[in-house]
């Protein structure tokens, strides 16, 4: 998503890439989302059991209002799948257009203090272990 920022995992290993995409890892993907509007916690609570979006049903979504500043609010979102533009579609469904989207974690991998444009290499053994590929990565 061109208008998103934050953590992105890059690899040139096809098996690793595929494994990272699958919801079967059970990994929680966390986002900080700035939306336009006055956020109602009751609306966010509707996401706990998943919702019907277009042609699919989402899994459970953890959503919490972090701070309301004027007509914008920061919401934290946690989900275990990653369909195309899913966070934006979820917030649109609730009536809150997204004006900033930052992925802060992807399973065990955290954005931490990395600044925009910075990179950090993850040891292949760590990735292999986290994905259950045990010594398969070269």
What do these predicted regions represent?
Residues 1-138:
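Basic, flexible Lys/Arg- and Gly-enriched helix-loop patches that mediate nucleic-acid binding at interfaces
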């Amino acid at each position: 998503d061109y208008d998103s920022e934050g953590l992105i995992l890059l690899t040139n290993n096809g098996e690793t890439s595929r494994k990272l995409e699958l919801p079967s890892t059970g990994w929680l993907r966390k986002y900080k989302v700035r939306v336009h509007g006055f956020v109602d916690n009751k609306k966010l609570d509707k996401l706990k059991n998943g919702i019907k979006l277009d042609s699919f049903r989402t899994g459970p979504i953890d959503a919490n209002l972090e701070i309301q500043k004027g007509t914008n609010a920061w919401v934290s979102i946690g989900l275990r799948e990653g369909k195309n533009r899913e966070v934006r579609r979820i917030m649109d469904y609730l009536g809150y257009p997204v004006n900033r989207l930052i992925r802060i974690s992807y399973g065990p991998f955290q954005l931490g203090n990395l600044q925009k444009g910075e990179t950090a290499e993850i040891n292949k053994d760590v990735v292999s272990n986290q994905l259950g590929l045990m010594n398969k990565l070269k």
